[in-house]
Structure formats: structure tokens, C-alpha cells
Amino acid sequence: MAKNTEIELKLLLSREGLEKMLQLDFMQQAMRPDSYKKRRLVSTYYDTADMTLTQHGIAYRVRDKGDGSFEATVKTSRQSKDGLSERLELNLPLAEAKPELNGFAALGLGYELSELAPNSVHALFTVDVERITYILDYAGAVIELAIDKGAIHCGEKSDSIDEVEFELMSGTVDALLELKERIASQVELRAEERSKFARGLALLQ
């Protein structure tokens, strides 16, 4: 697995389906004891007035991580098939919840954000979710299970979020796909091809 690469499987389940999935024997066995965490994440996405970053295939956000810390994140364009996506993800710690454009080139981003004027970006929309996470050890892989519930807010518009993400922390994609197939054999689910960023952009229309 390449450094700074996010490999993620995004799924949609009913509340009943989610509860059933969490109680499956192989899921219970995979969950690390005491890995449960619950927190509120508030992420604001930014771009220039002419959407320069989006045109370059870049999503830029600033996140309040709910524990007194803040983080800027850059993600490249997301190619998704059957809910599985792979893309570059770069994270930069922040002292406060304000956009910082310097530092990403040193992390491996080909596009130089620092060439933009500091005040040239503005908030597009905000994603506010309650996130529950577990760490899974499955088929030699380490996988983070994230359950997000909340909404995307764009002015007076909003779109609800109720999704499940499996992010590959280490190991093979085959393990991630095998886990999906085992879940799908017992729980009704659908792949979510849209990222939160793409859904937020749709609200801007």
C-alpha cells in the first residue's frame, strides 16, 4: 500500500442492517477490544471563487477533530467502482480551524497550493457528522470501520449523511473486498459511489 494513499470502501445500510452487521460473528471477532471511539467531526471545504482547486481535481478541507485539534486535508480526484476508491490523501496539523495553504508540496502534492493568495479561498460548505469507529483485524489486514451520521450544510440547503466506510490501514485490497462480500452475503447493502465532497458540490448548483 503506497504512502499517503487512501483506499476506502463506502457503503449504505439501513439502521437495521448496520446493527445486524455489527453483530455478525466474524465482525465481532475482527473488532479489536476497546477500539470503539465516538466523536463529532466538523469539516469545512474551501476553494477559490473560480473553483481552481476543484478544476485541478483537488478537494481541500479544514477539520475540527472534536478533541481540540485541527487538520487540513487535501484529497485528489476520487475514482470509485462498487464503492471502492483509491486516491492521494495528505494531512497537515493546524493550530486553529483556518485554511493553511503552505506545506502540502513537501508532503507530495504536485500542485502548489501556496501559489494561491492566503485570502483567495472561501468556504463552500460544511460537513458535520457524528463518527463512530472501530479497528478491525481481518485476513491479515488492519481496517478502520467508520459509521457517519450527520449532514452536509450549504447555505440554506442540506443533505443528510448516513453511511459506513471501511478504510484499509494496512494489508491488501483483497481483504477489504472479501470482507465486503461476507457482509453482503448476510446484510442488504448498497455501494455509495459519491464522496462527501461531490455531494457538497451538488448542493452548490
Model-assigned labels for residue ranges:
Residues 1-205:
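Phosphate-end processing signature that detects enzymes handling 5′-triphosphorylated RNA
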